[in-house]
A protein has these predicted regions:
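An intracellular "coupling" helix at the cytosolic face of ABC transporter transmembrane type-1 domains
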Residues: 11-17, 101-102, 118-127, 131, ...
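Transmembrane helices of ABC transporter permease
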Residues: 18-31, 52, 59, 63-66, ...
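Juxtamembrane loop-to-helix connectors within ABC transporter transmembrane domains
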Residues: 97-141
Length: 542
């Protein structure tokens, strides 16, 4: 049996009310399922008035109640499904957002998205749905065994021995926790997520698809990704089907043996007509329940892969978070020592820096020298114990409060698939006075003409480069940060538009810290401080 997992325990605690309700409704369904055949047996075994209206009405009344309860259960299940998937998908992404920056890049965001979807589907269907169903199956089996014991002791023994016989035979086939099914289940989830991720990345660049869509390399990439995933899926399914076929053969042999034995008992007067009808009704139900209980172990192998993804790839890679709330930033200082990606890839060996309110800092250096890596230390995307904000170690600050005050803008703007207004506000309450002031800026004219309700399409394909930057600038204004980091943010637009936006930004944030990474002297000439990274050394001028 699978070891307990922190994530699975959290889910049970959170949804125990729904799980218990689910179990209660299933108990009622189970009760009607059990009592119906018993009532029919009693009717058939009755020596007098066996088929009177009252007895027949009772039986059909039970059947009606059974299906009414099933109808109610289906509505409850659909409601529970919607609630669970909505809540847990959001909560799981919240966990993803707490992961280390480097780990998200290492796993790749699209891969993580695919694994999250697979995890939610697997956890819901197997942990929440199947396990409650197993409890009901066990109750049906116990009730059936009790009734069979009452009817015929020898038949009871035949029914009872099926459980250990099938269970231990199944365990032998699975070969314990480290079975092929466990390995296939985990590896298939990873490979399927990787395949879907790669295909989505290929299709995400519409320009590339249109330009090179008939190029064999693109189609070969899609084909290779599909082949790898589908080949493993075929291997896994073939093995699983082999196991299931053996189990099904054993189950059918045992079930048919039970039928033959029941008929034999009836012919020899060991059971009555009512007993014969009852046993025929419950025989399939009983063996299906045994199958449900045993087959859940196959499903638990898939569940294990999903739970391991949450615990080992997400939760074990949470970034460090301080508990000190940052209300404002007046100064940033520190030293850059051995900054990079491990001992073998050091980008900056040494250097000191110091910024204060009102500073506009330009950062220059050759491509790949560590400019972006350096600025990502300032918002804790990358970790360092040598950065100080207002004289305190940056690692002591709460990540959320820090990132509300330090805004990092990469070259590729981060726009969401929602309205322009929502992209500006980013879920914040509207500060009416600040909003009215924003709308009066000249750079907002073109955005207002096109409409704040305009929906941003994938990759912001319906917006010009200049409009994208203006939306980001408007978002900045509404966020009111203390530090703005521009990482070649204006490279996608012409210099005239970029310089105009930079002038606006400087005018708005005269008492803030502005940091710009750029190769263009036009932007660097606006700076009162310059940092150059050269020969793995960070040097601050002025």
């Amino acid at each position: 049996m699978m070891k307990k997992n922190k994530y699975s325990r959290e889910l049970f605690i959170k949804y125990r009310k729904y799980v218990y309700t689910n179990i209660i409704i299933l108990f009622i369904i189970t009760f009607w399922s059990i009592i119906g055949p018993i009532v029919l047996r009693s009717v058939l075994n009755s020596s007098n008035n066996a088929f009177n209206t009252k007895n027949i009405a009772m039986y059909f009344g039970i059947v009606v109640l059974l299906y009414v309860t099933k109808y109610i259960y289906n509505h409850f299940k659909f409601y529970f499904t919607e609630k669970f998937k909505n809540n847990e998908t959001v909560d799981l992404y919240e966990k993803v957002f707490r992961m280390k920056y480097s780990k998200i890049n290492e796993l790749e965001p699209t891969y993580i998205t695919e694994r999250v979807s697979l995890t939610i589907e697997t956890v819901f269907s197997l942990y929440v749905s199947s396990l409650t169903g197993i409890l009901v199956s066990c109750i049906i089996m116990i009730a059936t065994l009790g009734m069979v014991f009452y009817i015929n002791k020898l038949l009871f023994i035949l029914y009872f021995v099926q459980i250990p016989l099938q269970y231990f035979g199944f365990q032998k086939l699975l070969n314990g926790e480290n079975s092929k099914l466990a390995h296939y289940g985990t590896e298939l989830q990873k490979l399927r997520a990787t395949s879907n991720k790669n295909i989505k990345l290929i299709l995400s660049d519409v320009n590339g698809v249109k330009q090179y869509g008939k190029n064999s390399i693109i189609l070969d990439l899609i084909r290779d990704n599909l082949k790898k995933a589908n080949a493993l899926e075929r291997t896994a399914n073939t093995y699983a089907m082999s196991v299931c076929t053996v189990l099904e053969f054993i189950s059918i042999c045992l079930k048919n043996s039970s039928y033959l034995f029941i008929i034999y008992m009836y012919i020899n007067g060991g059971v009555s007509v009512g007993d014969l009808v009852y046993l025929n009704l419950v025989n399939d139900i009983y063996y299906n329940c045994i199958g449900d209980v045993i087959n859940i172990q196959i499903n638990l192998r898939n569940l294990k892969g999903s739970l391991d993804f949450v615990s080992k790839e997400i939760e074990d890679n949470f970034e460090e978070n301080g508990d000190k709330i940052l209300s404002e930033i007046c100064t940033i200082s520190g030293s850059a020592e051995n900054i990079g990606y491990g001992k073998e890839n050091v980008l900056i060996k040494q250097g000191e820096f110091s910024f204060a309110r009102g500073d506009v800092i330009g950062i220059k250096g050759e491509s790949g020298c560590g400019k972006t890596t350096f600025v990502k230390l300032l918002n804790k995307f990358e970790e360092s114990n040598r950065i100080y904000i207002n004289g305190s170690d940056i690692m002591k600050y709460d990540n959320t409060s820090l990132r509300e005050k330090v805004i990092y803008l990469p070259q590729n703007t981060y726009l969401l698939p929602c309205s322009v207004k929502d992209n500006i506000l980013m879920g914040r309450e509207v500060d009416e006075s600040r909003w009215e002031k924003l709308l009066k800026y000249d750079f907002m004219t073109n955005i207002l003409d096109k409409g704040l309700d305009k929906i941003v399409l994938e990759n912001a394909s319906n917006l010009s480069g200049g409009d994208r930057q203006k939306i980001i600038l408007a978002r900045l204004f509404m966020q009111n940060p203390d530090v703005v980091i521009l990482d070649e943010s204006f490279n996608a637009i012409d210099e005239e538009t970029g310089e105009s936006l930079f002038e606006i930004l400087k005018a708005i944030y005269t008492d803030k810290i502005i940091i710009i990474i750029s190769h263009s002297p036009k932007y660097l000439n606006h700076c009162n401080k310059i940092i150059e990274i050269k020969d793995k050394e960070l040097i601050q001028f002025r």
